[in-house]
Amino acid sequence: MAKTLYEKVWDAHIVVAAEGEAPIIYVDRHLVHEVTSPQAFSGLEVAGRKMRAPEKTFATMDHNTSTTSASLDALSPMARTQVQTLERNCKEFGVRLYDIHHKNQGIVHVMGPELGITLPGTVIVCGDSHTATHGAFGALAFGIGTSEVEHVMATQTLRQLKAKTMKIEVRGHVAEGITAKDIVLAIIGKIGMDGGTGYVVEFCGEAIEALTMEGRMTVCNMAIEMGAKAGMIAPDATTAEYLKGREFAPKGDNWQQAIAAWAELKSDADATFDATVVLQASDIAPQLTWGTNPGQVVAIDQFVPNPAEETNSTVRSSIEKALEYVDLSAGTLMTNVGINKVFIGSCTNSRIEDLRAAAVHAKGRQVAEGVKAIVVPGSGLVKEQAEAEGLDKIFLEAGFEWRLPGCSMCLAMNDDKLEAGDRCASTSNRNFEGRQGRGSRTHLVSPAMAAAAAVAGHFVDIRKPY
């Protein structure tokens, strides 16, 4: 029987599939951070349980850490308690921890892949909604709740219902300057923020195959923003080249065996999907969101939509509400929208490729007057590589702030927040009301678009001189 990539990985991980019950699947890798793990560890303590396989759990500090200082003194009392609790729990239960002083510390969805913790064909979970990032490697990766975190710790399994399958094919090749972020925003714009609900999405097509692993991670990272359970991309030579030699990747004979096994991790030619979506890559322009969800997105050369032109009353009301919150007028050309904050970072766009793309637009220029722009590498390894390439100097000379790794301004949980009324060009993944701070306005863009906005003081079409 022909199978999709998702079905192959799913079937290989079923432990028990009793009739009339949700199957129990095995979990290969469990990633944890300081925010969603304390209650889970506490639950184990109360029940007197040990972890089933502590060597398969990896922990880092990222959500509530400071990006200006590696000192605990720089943290709020709540954040300090969270990181200290994680440190204590990891020590007690024997979990490998990348704390704020570790050279490999970083955002969990950046750190995991770059260390080779993320591998094709595995099931990966984390108490974080953007766990789908790891699907870029052909893994089945999805976010779980805190009670499920405890369950995985105790049993290394989860009870899960099988999802429907969706194929999203991006045919042909994108124009120069069009990035993975533009591709995934265009996809979300086409199917909407709930178009993938109930599905595991497989991204494919020439435009997807041409992406680097960094780009593929950006695409899968935002699968959740279209409502999908997970996003996956079949592993190939690009995947193997990225993983080869990384700390937790297979070595020696095991590597050759892994390569052979990974070659089978692709949807069969005659496999059927429950839904199929097709985009033409050549139609994709630089994208940016105008409203309060990732599906409210347009191309840079387009206008803020007019709710009066929308025939669906529910959609019309949503547009009106979003326009009121973001304080934009219908019909405004997006290149006329000014910004006063820029955030380059997050688990969506804080890898070395992202920083290189942003640096191209920062080099030899200056951040516009009245604009504050920060660059936050996704991990210690990304920061180290960027500094070896001199990217930090490019940003600093242009007036950007160069920070320590962490989730930072993606969410209003740490000290990196926007003020009410701020308008931010952000490379993150969510532009919900208050996501970056109460009353803040977020426009999701690629790293190149964010850096260009920083120096121009407004959004620009990076395909043209500015």
Swiss-Prot record:
Similarity comment: family membership: Belongs to the aconitase/IPM isomerase family. LeuC type 1 subfamily.
Pathway: Amino-acid biosynthesis; L-leucine biosynthesis; L-leucine from 3-methyl-2-oxobutanoate: step 2/4
UniProt catalytic activity: (2R,3S)-3-isopropylmalate = (2S)-2-isopropylmalate
Keywords: 4Fe-4S, Amino-acid biosynthesis, Branched-chain amino acid biosynthesis, Iron, Iron-sulfur, Leucine biosynthesis, Lyase, Metal-binding
A Pfam family: Aconitase
EC number: 4.2.1.33
Segment forming the signal sequence: none
Primary gene name: leuC
Record's keyword annotation contains Kinase: no
Cofactor(s), names only, from the UniProt record: [4Fe-4S] cluster
InterPro entries associated with the record: 3-IsopropMal_deHydase_lsu, Acnase/IPM_dHydase_lsu_aba_1/3, Acoase/IPM_deHydtase_lsu_aba, Aconitase_4Fe-4S_BS, Aconitase_4Fe-4S_dom, IPM_dehydratase_rel_enz, IPMI_cat
Name of this chain's protein: 3-isopropylmalate dehydratase large subunit
